[in-house]
Curated annotation (Swiss-Prot):
Gene, per the UniProt record: ABCI17
Top-level taxon of the source organism: Eukaryota
One GO BP annotation of this record: phosphate ion transmembrane transport
Record-linked Gene3D superfamilies: P-loop containing nucleotide triphosphate hydrolases (3.40.50.300)
Keywords from the named record: ATP-binding, Nucleotide-binding, Transport
Domain ABC transporter: 29-260
GO cellular component: plant-type vacuole; plasma membrane
Species in which this protein is naturally found: Arabidopsis thaliana
Name the record gives this protein: ABC transporter I family member 17
GO MF terms, alphabetically ordered: ATP binding; ATP hydrolysis activity; phosphate transmembrane transporter activity
CDD domains: ABC_PstB_phosphate_transporter
UniProt binding sites for ATP: 62-69
Family: Belongs to the ABC transporter superfamily. ABCI family.
Length: 263
């Protein structure tokens, strides 16, 4: 059975994960010994090894500067990982055409960036690049998935709140029919109501489309709400992998301190 953690030397963690990972689940993403070295020689990521099962929402939390965003961006080659370190459905992503990869592995950032034109123009952007035309009904359906009604289709970015713009950016990403969603602090700039809307959409996408999701967040409450599994990252390493309900059981000293200060 594949686990979320593949460090053979840490038997206690592997045994614990028997109860965390769904039996028989296959990894959608496999990361093996992923390391990134900064220009000054320091290591941003230190041999990260993890399996992410298909259809799960994996939360990634930890102190600022611990390597969370670097890890996330390596999964769709926004940061180019070394060969044979990141695999999607068993295939080394460095061998996959980068445009095709980013269609399969979509990403949403902290601040939404919309293109000129209407909301509908934004949603159609990816399909248009592929020579595909989305009907109005298809646009409305994608907006609905992002918790926006059809009336938004004709609006421009200037008419939207930041929370609404973030949901348009999500609908635009969904138009590419991604198998995986990478979310880099997607609600940190949003008000509580908009944050709740995005969280509800994340859970809905898992239930309705089975999308595998990796979300980086500083909000413990958010991760406990949406995630199936939580990875705690400290100093470039995944030091704990727990169920959301078990975060209080973290044993790594820095992870414990982060959780205490964040709660």
């Amino acid at each position: 059975m594949p686990s979320l953690w593949s460090n053979e030397s840490d038997g206690s963690l592997r045994e614990h994960l028997v109860d965390v990972v769904v039996s028989g689940s296959e990894p959608k993403i496999r990361v093996h010994d992923l390391t990134r070295v900064a220009d000054d020689g320091s290591r941003i990521l230190k041999g990260v090894t993890i399996d992410i099962p298909k259809g799960m929402i994996v939360g990634v939390i930890g102190p600022s500067g611990s390597g969370k965003s670097t890890f996330l961006r390596s999964l769709n080659r926004l940061w180019e990982p070394p060969e044979s370190t990141v695999f999607l459905d068993g295939e080394d992503i460095t061998n996959v055409d980068v445009i095709a990869l980013r269609r399969r592995v979509g990403m949403l950032f902290q601040l939404p960036v919309l293109f000129q034109g209407t909301v509908a123009d934004n949603v159609r952007y990816g399909p248009n690049l592929r020579g595909e035309k989305l009907s109005d009904e298809e646009v409305y359906k994608l907006l609905s998935l992002a918790d926006l009604d059809a009336s938004f289709a004709k609006k421009t970015g200037a008419e939207l709140s930041v929370g609404q713009a973030q949901r348009v950016a999500l609908a635009r990403t969904l138009a590419n029919e991604p198998e995986v969603l990478l979310l880099d602090e997607p609600t940190s700039a949003l008000d509580p109501i908009s944050t709740e809307n995005i969280e509800d959409v994340i859970v809905k996408l898992k239930k309705q489309r089975g999308i595998t999701t990796v979300i980086v967040s500083h909000s413990i409450k958010q991760i406990q709400k949406v995630a199936d599994i939580v990875c705690l990252v400290v100093d470039g390493e995944i030091v704990e992998v727990l169920k959301p309900s078990e975060l209080s059981h973290a044993t790594h000293p820095m992870a414990q301190r982060f959780l205490q200060l964040s709660s």
